[in-house]
Curated annotation (Swiss-Prot):
One of its GO terms (cellular component) is extracellular region. Contains 2 disulfide bonds that can be either 'C1-C3, C2-C4' or 'C1-C4, C2-C3', since these disulfide connectivities have been observed for conotoxins with cysteine framework V (for examples, see AC P0DQQ7 and AC P81755). Residues 23-48 form a propeptide. It comes from the Eukaryota. It comes from Conus pennaceus (Feathered cone). This is Conotoxin Pn-B01121. The cysteine framework is V (CC-CC). One of its GO terms (molecular function) is toxin activity. Disulfide bonds: none annotated. Residues 1-22 form the signal peptide. Belongs to the conotoxin T superfamily.
Amino acid sequence: MCCLPVFVILLLLIASAPSVDALPKTKDDMSLASFHDNAKRTLQILSNKRYCCVYDYSCCLSWG
């Protein structure tokens, strides 16, 4: 039972610890929204290429 107060104090300290979001941003940091937009754009390009190549092979040649 004497360990219970120590355990509770540790839980409170862990909960109040600063998170990763509290770190200051630098000029090299990229926002997560921008990262998701780039990923979405890349997936759209790849899916368009896959669709194009299935139905028209000459279209694939224009992709490089």
